[in-house]
Amino acid sequence: MSKKALCIISGGMDSTLCAYLAKKEGYEIIALHFDYEQRTQEKEKECFKQICKALKVEKSYILDVSFIKDIGGNALTDKSIDIPKNELCISDVPPITYVPFRNGIFLSIAGSLAEKENCESIFIGVVEEDGSGYPDCTDEFIQKAQEFINEGTSKNFKVCIKTPLVRLNKAKIVELALKENVPLELTWSCYESEDEACGECDSCLLRLRGFEKAGFKDKIKYKS
């Protein structure tokens, strides 16, 4: 019986690279995508499907967690709140693009699905540099989430949450992704736009800076 990993894939660079690294480690990948009615949900879903096809994933889930939009309080799900432009967040206070406890919600659901599918690992593409003050993107948080899942599931089930990128910066992530032949042109990072990336939001700026520092050109289309 092959070992299985549940890979949370948003459609972005980091989670996609994590899935490729899981495959390299010999895991059978079960792919998981969350639809929480974020601004770019349709583009992210399209990217997820293309990435699954590229990885030859046989089993995938797209789960509706739109209640996150009902909770609100962030610019990703509330279009009345402007996405900050042309500034990277360097504060310890989470920016308005922070979705409260999003990774906690995702990992709780992933823990349930991992137990059902008998996965020994969960891969999630959290990156502390990208965290921009996000408290649920730290290594410490992930370790506590793993303890929580293992405490709340059956005694004969134990899962390891793997975060191979957590200490890397964006340039190193780009370099590693290209080394592993990850099709980054299939990924999407923009918080705001679905046709052409805005090039101005925090996520676009981090992505562009990563490509620039790595010495490569990003193949996706940008408005600016």
From Swiss-Prot:
Catalyzes the ATP-dependent conversion of 7-carboxy-7-deazaguanine (CDG) to 7-cyano-7-deazaguanine (preQ(0)). ATP binds at I9, S10, G11, G12, M13, D14, S15, T16, L17, C18, A19. GO terms for molecular function: ATP binding; ligase activity, forming carbon-nitrogen bonds; zinc ion binding. Binds 1 zinc ion per subunit. Pathway: Purine metabolism; 7-cyano-7-deazaguanine biosynthesis. Pfam families: QueC. Its cofactor is Zn(2+). The keyword Kinase does not apply. One of its GO terms (biological process) is queuosine biosynthetic process. Coiled coil: none annotated. The keyword Membrane does not apply. Keywords: ATP-binding, Ligase, Metal-binding, Nucleotide-binding, Queuosine biosynthesis, Zinc. Its EC number is 6.3.4.20. This is 7-cyano-7-deazaguanine synthase. It catalyses: 7-carboxy-7-deazaguanine + NH4(+) + ATP = 7-cyano-7-deazaguanine + ADP + phosphate + H2O + H(+). Transmembrane segments: none annotated. Belongs to the QueC family. NCBIfam families: 7-cyano-7-deazaguanine synthase QueC. Zn(2+) binds at C190, C198, C201, C204. Signal peptide: none annotated.
